[in-house]
Amino acid sequence: MVYESGNKPGPENPTFSSDLSLSDSLVKLKKKPCEVCGSDANELLMMTCFMCRDTREHTYCARVMFQRVPRLWICEECRDFSSVANKTANAQSSRTIQVEQVVVKQVRIDQTVPSPRTNQVVDNHQDPPIDQTDPSSTTIQVVDNENLIEAAPSSRSNQVVDNKDWIEAAPSLRSNQVVPVAPRIHEFTTDESSSPVSPCSLDDETNLFHFKYPSLSLPPLMKN
């Protein structure tokens, strides 16, 4: 057999050596044992991790048993790492969503609550307040007060008139209750004389009772 280059493939040829090293690396990669059982047998049932390309397991040695080698298989270490990364990403996304919701609420509040400056501008369109120091406004106020005083009668005077009418119309209750009482004179007899003696008499001018006793006789209550 004649070669065009004129050199036979051998250890001295660099092309041959590179091809040999590549084939050796492929053999070593294929010969890596199973991570579970440690055997490199049954190469057709050996699964290689799609992410790390380092972990190898048999279909019957994996935690979940497979009937055949799947197209994409991920080892447990890569799966745990991806789950942690997903949790971190989900937490960050949820936090971002919460911050966005807070910002949206603040924007809505700012839009719904009117500005006090705006209210002040709207209120300025109303009639200006009356200046108390202005003489024209003071004169108008005095005239209005006088008109009110002249137009409206005094409620106090009306009340006095009503009270007088009531006093004249209604008789006095105290005068109706006074009943004339006739004075009574009690007569007492003494041992000295059998004639009746009036020890007390009613004075018409002062309406007081005066007790009158004989000079030698004692009052009835003080006799022994």
From Swiss-Prot:
Zn(2+) 2 binds at C49, C52, C75, C78. One of its GO terms (biological process) is negative regulation of transcription elongation by RNA polymerase II. Zn(2+) 1 binds at C34, C37, H58, C61. Disruption phenotype: No obvious developmental defects. Plants missing all PHD finger-containing proteins (e.g. PHD1, PAIPP2/PHD2, AIPP2/PHD3, PHD4, PHD5 and PHD6) exhibit an increased expression of flowering genes leading to an early flowering phenotype under long-day conditions as well as growth retardation. Keywords: Metal-binding, Transcription, Transcription regulation, Zinc, Zinc-finger. InterPro entries: PHD1-3/5-6 (IPR049914), Znf_FYVE_PHD (IPR011011), Znf_RING/FYVE/PHD (IPR013083). A zinc finger (PHD-type) spans 31-81. The keyword Metal-binding applies. Residues 116-137 are annotated as: Disordered. GO terms for molecular function: histone reader activity; zinc ion binding. It comes from the Eukaryota. SUPFAM superfamilies: FYVE/PHD zinc finger. Together with AIPP3/BDT1, cooperates to form a BAH-PHD bivalent histone reader complex able to read histone H3 lysine 27 trimethylation (H3K27me3) histone marks in order to regulate transcription, especially to prevent early flowering; promotes AIPP3/BDT1 binding to H3K27me3. Interacts directly with AIPP3/BDT1. This is PHD finger-containing protein 5.
